[in-house]
A protein has these predicted regions:
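Conserved beta-strand-loop surface patch within small alpha/beta domains used
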Residues: 1-77, 86-141
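Metallo-beta-lactamase
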Residues: 83
Length: 141
């Protein structure tokens, strides 16, 4: 990830869209592996939050399994994804308050706007406080 953009393969966007569509009324979440500045793989992780319609908590065992697979593929954690089922793909006040991980992009997806996938990236760590990062979609990967 550079300061201004992040490369994401079209097939990864489609995988995220499919995941959103499996549970359209709940927030879904997952991890994205790759190399700095470029996504390579999407790892869906169960949302174990009791308030799944507007919050997410990544399942710990699912996170560990995804990180082990990333390591075996020589990938690192480059983004954390979650969906907003009824609003736009912008950080909520809770997303901003909880912050992000330094150097890890926060991807937010939504189909809440006319059923069309909206996917956006943000840096939610304390230093950046919600700065948007342009997502560049390509056919590679």
């Amino acid at each position: 990830m550079t300061d201004t953009h992040f490369l994401i393969p079209r097939k990864l966007v489609l995988a995220i869209l499919h995941h959103i569509q499996t549970q359209p009324e709940q927030e879904v979440c997952g991890l994205v592996g790759g190399n700095p500045g470029k996504a390579a793989s999407y790892y869906p992780v169960d949302n174990i939050d009791p308030l799944k319609t507007n919050r997410f908590t990544l399942d710990g065992a699912g996170q560990i399994a995804a990180l082990k697979t990333m390591r075996s593929r020589n990938e690192t954690l480059v983004a954390i994804f979650h969906s907003h089922p009824h609003t736009t793909a912008q950080p909520s006040s809770l997303d901003i308050a909880l912050g992000g991980h330094s150097g890890v992009l926060s991807l937010i997806g939504s189909t809440g706007t006319r059923g069309v996938l909206e996917l956006r990236g943000y840096r939610l760590d304390a230093a950046e406080n919600g700065a948007e990062v342009e997502l560049l979609m390509g056919d590679e990967g």
